[in-house]
Amino acid sequence: AESHNDNSLRDPSPFIQTNLVGTFTLLEAVRRHKVRFHHISTDEVYGDLELDDPAKFEPTTPYNPSSPYSSSKAGSDLLVRAWVRSFGVEATISNCSNNYGPYQHIEKFIPRQITNLIDGVRPKLYGAGENVRDWIHVLDHNDAVWDIIEKGRIGETYLIGADGEKNNKEVVELILELMGHAPDDYEHVADRPGHDMRYAIDNSKLVEELGWAPRFTDFRSGLQATIDWYRDNEAWWRPLKAEVEAKYAAQGQ
């Protein structure tokens, strides 16, 4: 899937082709071959929540996407539901909150800050940094998807989150602290247009039906392990760095 919001604002076309046409192509293939299908999606299809709102996203929350990326994912979710109902495709859907951990593309928020600091560049924080994300370690996400594939009910949607709400300012300050810098040693840059304020997942359906539970519940230690991974695996991300930063620089970010 195409999954980076900033890229969808620069050029929405690949998101339509990959996330919508790509999902249609896969659905037709599984319909033809009569195989089980699991569709991985995002909590961004639900739009956003107010910072002081106690509510969380639930499987029944109405869709309200706000970007080309989230709109393309919402459309792909609806295609899956239609193929289940219209053609009897055996499929499930999961909508997950923000991931972190090893092997994440360095255009993403956390690895970008880590690799900038490795390069001696101050982290960049969009706007005031008040936007809240519900962080989950990628290995917990993987475990949840496997549980859904093995035990999930056909046609159902499961929300994946680990109760890891933190605003972007808190995350940047923790990265700085863990990497030996003053917690205020970052730059404020222009905010993303239409930047969603808060995401939060109600994972009770996943927990109660399938017995899933996150293993990486300490964000600080998970983030430290992630920092260590990027330090130890520069050969993996280094070839991507210049191009990623050039794209951000063109937008003043």
Predicted stretch roles:
Residues 52-53, 106-114:
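A glycine/serine/threonine-rich, flexible loop-to-helix segment
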Residues 65-72, 96, 102, 106-110, ...:
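The catalytic Tyr-centered alpha-helix of NAD(P)H-dependent dehydrogenases
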Residues 75, 79, 83, 113, ...:
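Hydrophobic alpha-helix immediately C-terminal to the catalytic Tyr-X-X-X-Lys motif of short-chain
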